[in-house]
């Protein structure tokens, strides 16, 4: 084995190793999820080198420098104030979703007008209109981190795959018998998964456009799905109150997570794939062991339905958003609530951490989005100006751009 190069991954912090084995180029990652501003870098490098034979003594200084660069990134954007940069009247009919590519250089909007539009974030210019669906375009995604393809899922029961560069449709995936309401690319960008009101999810091959597997087992609509970091597992959350873990390589059921007593609203893995977080209309979130499917904790405290939930990039913090108008931050280790985010005057339907993990973004029916301190729960900023409910909001990878989508048919870029 011969080490060819070292690459940085900023969020979550890590070093990627490119090496040659039997003439083949391979990559592996060293996750540095516990890296903090006060970490002793020399001691950490020593520890890493003990565990990783590819990092010989001749690489010590290089690895030190890389980790110092990661350390510097950790505190960036902590005092960033967002200003309204552009208001885009994106579509004639209502918007359904917004999504950013990894760098934040462009984003997409889905709409009831049956199209998906691609936008340049810096100028607010429309780059392309993806036309071809025969009904509402509801679920949309980039194949991040690559960002050269877009998937759109529609009420016309099909999913389409598009080129970002040309706007050309590569494939139309047909097979669902009801509306497609969620979709996701696997991390390797070889598969796209679609979830439907027909109670099934399907995996599709991006290269040849063929269906790979149908995931059957739910008895009601699938409204949430996501892959784990390594791409070998996929979870589907359903209105049947359960979440199913599937083997993405075989299409087989691995575990059924039973315990919620109402519809599932969100389901996601933490970064190291050890835990699954589920949110439900039963006012609770649950944490599950991703290997055996056992429930390890129930996160309580909200007075109404949980509408969204997420881990931060390192998996140390959990955020929950509720119809009770509050959000909460929990420690994944202790499962205790460490902050309650109060200030919205309507239900919170979207919540996400910035990649640095120090800020949270919430979108609400009170027509505002808010930025919060993820440690203290203090509201740092209110993003005002929309004239109707905000249903979608997102940070870019650097954490210095926010996009908000509203029922007022506009998208706002904040930077």
UniProtKB/Swiss-Prot annotation:
Localization per Swiss-Prot or TrEMBL: Cytoplasm, Cytoskeleton, Flagellum basal body; Cytoplasm, Cytoskeleton, Flagellum axoneme
InterPro entries (alphabetical): G-protein_beta_WD-40_rep, WD40/YVTN_repeat-like_dom_sf, WD40_repeat_CS, WD40_repeat_dom_sf, WD40_rpt
Keyword ATP-binding in annotation: no
Signal peptide (from-to): none
A GO CC term attached to the entry: extracellular region
Pfam families associated with the record: WD40 (PF00400)
Keywords linked to the UniProt accession: Cell projection, Ciliopathy, Cilium, Cytoplasm, Cytoskeleton, Disease variant, Flagellum, Primary ciliary dyskinesia, Repeat, WD repeat
Organism superkingdom: Eukaryota
WD repeats: 90-129, 132-174, 175-214, 217-256, 259-298, 301-340, 343-384, 386-415
GO molecular function: ubiquitin-like ligase-substrate adaptor activity
Segments crossing the lipid bilayer: none
Protein task: Required for axonemal dynein assembly and ciliary motility in ciliated organs, including Kupffer's vesicle, during embryogenesis. Facilitates the onset of robust cilia motility during development.
Connected disease: Ciliary dyskinesia, primary, 52: A form of primary ciliary dyskinesia, a disorder characterized by abnormalities of motile cilia. Respiratory infections leading to chronic inflammation and bronchiectasis are recurrent, due to defects in the respiratory cilia. CILD52 is an autosomal recessive form characterized by laterality defects, and mild respiratory symptoms.
Subunit note: Interacts with IFT46.
Name of the protein in its database record: Dynein assembly factor with WD repeat domains 1
């Amino acid at each position: 084995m011969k080490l060819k190069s070292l690459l940085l991954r900023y969020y979550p912090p890590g070093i990627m190793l490119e090496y040659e084995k039997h003439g083949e180029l391979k990559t592996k990652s060293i996750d540095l999820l516990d890296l903090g501003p006060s970490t002793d870098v020399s001691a950490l490098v020593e520890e890493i080198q003990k565990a990783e034979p590819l990092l010989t003594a001749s690489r010590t200084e290089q690895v030190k420098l890389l980790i110092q660069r990661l350390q510097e990134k950790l505190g960036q954007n902590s005092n960033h104030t967002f200003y309204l940069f552009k208001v885009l009247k994106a579509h004639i009919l209502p918007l359904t979703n917004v999504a950013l590519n990894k760098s934040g250089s462009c984003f997409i909007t889905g709409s009831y007008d049956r199209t998906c539009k691609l936008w340049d974030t810096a100028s607010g210019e429309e780059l392309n209109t993806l036309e071809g669906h025969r009904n509402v375009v509801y679920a949309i995604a980039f194949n991040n981190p690559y960002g050269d393809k877009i998937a759109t899922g529609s009420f016309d029961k099909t999913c389409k795959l598009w080129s970002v560069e040309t706007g050309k449709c590569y494939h139309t995936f047909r097979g669902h018998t009801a509306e497609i309401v969620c979709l996701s690319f696997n991390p390797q960008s070889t598969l796209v998964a679609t979830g439907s009101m027909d109670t099934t999810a399907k995996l599709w091959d991006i290269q040849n456009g063929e269906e790979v597997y149908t995931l059957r087992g739910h008895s009601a609509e699938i409204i949430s799905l996501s892959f784990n970091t390594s791409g070998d597992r996929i979870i589907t959350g359903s209105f049947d109150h359960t979440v199913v873990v599937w083997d993405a390589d075989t299409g087989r059921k691995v575990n059924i997570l039973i315990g919620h007593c109402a519809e599932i609203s969100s389901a996601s893995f933490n970064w190291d794939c050890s835990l699954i977080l589920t949110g439900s209309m039963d006012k609770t979130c649950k944490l599950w062991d991703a290997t055996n499917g056992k429930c390890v904790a129930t996160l309580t405290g909200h007075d109404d339905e949980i509408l969204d939930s997420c881990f931060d990039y390192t998996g140390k913090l959990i955020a929950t958003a509720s119809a009770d108008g509050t959000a909460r931050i929990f420690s994944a280790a202790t499962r205790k609530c460490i902050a309650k985010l109060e200030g919205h005057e309507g239900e919170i339907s979207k919540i996400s951490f910035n990649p640095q993990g120090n800020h949270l973004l919430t979108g609400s029916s009170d027509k505002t989005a808010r930025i919060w301190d993820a440690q203290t729960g203090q509201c740092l900023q209110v993003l005002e100006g929309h004239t109707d409910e905000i249903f979608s909001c997102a940070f870019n990878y650097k954490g210095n751009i926010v996009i908000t989508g509203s029922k007022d048919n506009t998208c706002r870029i904040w930077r």
